[in-house]
C-alpha cells in the first residue's frame, strides 16, 4: 500500500521488491521491461508481422490486451461459469492491422489464452511477471486519461466535472496491485469508495455475512490507500473517520466529496510513471539492448532516451491531424494528461494544445470503421528536454500541504507558480452544509483559504538537457502566467464509457 508507513519507491512497488538499493531497483525494472520486449518480439513472429506492422501502435495495443486478458483470472473464471454465446472463454484475440497491396487491412485473430500465457512466461524466464502486466495496464490507463474525459462518471457519483484533474487511473482494473494504487488520483479513489457506499445503501446484504466481511476489508484498504495520498493531518483524520464508520452511508459520501474538492487545492500525492507501449520495448530488445544489464527507471531520463530513438507508427483516419495524434500519445507515454500545458510544451519543445483543440480521436480503431480510407504516419514522440516525474502533487511548503496547483495534477518536478482563482474553488464549498460539521472540515477550509496563488511549486526544480543524464544542471523555465494550462478545461473530449 502506497505510503502506509512504509515508504517504498515506485520501482519497488513496480517490482514487488523488498527494500532494494537504486542499482537493484534499476535492474529489476529493466528486467520487467526486457520481458515485455521479448514477449512482443515473439508475438510479432507468431503473427508474421513486418517491422513496420510491428511498430504500429494499434497492433501493440491488441497484443498487450491479449496478454492482459489471458492473465485475468477472475474474468476467466467468470466467463467459464457464465458461458455467453459466441464467446470462447479459453480464447483471446483482437484486430491486427497488416499492409496488403498498399492498403491497410484488418485481420481478426484468435489465440488460446494458454498459448499466450506460455509465450509470456517464456519471455519472462518462466515467471508470471505480474509487474510487467501491471506496467501495461498503467500504459493503457495513461492513454485513456489523455484520450477521454470522465465528466459523466464524475456526475454519476455526485462529483463535480471540474474535478477531472483528480481522475488519473480511473480506468485501471482493481487487480493492478500496489503499482496501480500509487498512480490513482484522489478522485479515482473517492469514486471507487462512493460506488461501494451507494451499493451498501441500496443492497442491505452488501456489508453482511462472509462476503460482507471481504467487502469490508476491501473498503478499509481503499480508505487507507486514499488516506496515504493526502498530505495534511486534517484530511487524513477525516479519512480515518470514513474508514471507521460502522455502516458507511450518506455522511461518508458527503465527507468523501468534501475531501475530493479539498484535493483541488490541498493536492494528494499521486505517482507518475512513463509507461511506453510494448512496440517501443520490443525493437529495443531486438536491436540488442539489454535492459536488465543497463538498468531502467520509469521516473527518470530512460523513457525519454528510449523515445528519442524509437520509430512508432499509427493508423490515421482521413480527417485527423498526425501532429495531434502524436501529442495524444506523447502525453500518454509520460502520464501527462493532467500536467500544466505550459510545462508539457516546454519539455516537449512544441506547443501542447488543449484536448478540445485536437483534431484527433482515440488511438484505437473501432471494428466498424472503414479501412479503405485509413492511412498511417509516424508518431513524433521525441522531446526537447527531460524532467523527473513527481508524486508530490506540487504543494509548496514541504512537510505541510499548502496550495497545490488547481485543475492540474503535476507530472514533472519543474518549478512553476500557481495560477488559480481561489474564489472559483471556494465557491464549490459554499452551500453544502450537509454531512458532519467538524473541526477537521473547518481546518481544511482554513488551510485552503490561506493558500496563496503567488506561491511557487517545486522551487528550484528544472528540466534537463537530454545529454545531462545525471541531472546535474537544472534549467528553470519561466512561464507566461497569463493563461493557466489545463488540458481538459473548456473541452468536448469524448467520454470514456466502456
Curated annotation (Swiss-Prot):
SUPFAM superfamilies: flu NP-like
Motif (Bipartite nuclear localization signal): 198-216
TM region positions: none
Alphabetical keyword list: Capsid protein, Helical capsid protein, Host nucleus, Host-virus interaction, Ribonucleoprotein, RNA-binding, Viral nucleoprotein, Viral penetration into host nucleus, Virion, Virus entry into host cell
Main location: virion
UniProt PTM: Late in virus-infected cells, may be cleaved from a 56-kDa protein to a 53-kDa protein by a cellular caspase. This cleavage might be a marker for the onset of apoptosis in infected cells or have a specific function in virus host interaction.
Gene Ontology CC: helical viral capsid; host cell; host cell nucleus; ribonucleoprotein complex; viral nucleocapsid
Motif Unconventional nuclear localization signal mapped to chain: 1-18
Start-end of Basic and acidic residues biased regions: 8-21
Annotated compartments: Virion; Host nucleus
Superkingdom classification of source: Viruses
Keyword Endoplasmic reticulum: no
Region (Disordered): 1-21
One record GO biological process: symbiont entry into host cell
GO molecular function, one term: structural molecule activity
Subunit and interaction comment: Homomultimerizes to form the nucleocapsid. May bind host exportin-1/XPO1. Binds to viral genomic RNA. Protein-RNA contacts are mediated by a combination of electrostatic interactions between positively charged residues and the phosphate backbone and planar interactions between aromatic side chains and bases.
HAMAP family (alphabetical): INFV_NCAP
Protein family per UniProt: Belongs to the influenza viruses nucleoprotein family.
Function: Encapsidates the negative strand viral RNA, protecting it from nucleases. The encapsidated genomic RNA is termed the ribonucleoprotein (RNP) and serves as template for transcription and replication. The RNP needs to be localized in the host nucleus to start an infectious cycle, but is too large to diffuse through the nuclear pore complex. NP comprises at least 2 nuclear localization signals that are responsible for the active RNP import into the nucleus through cellular importin alpha/beta pathway.
The protein's name: Nucleoprotein
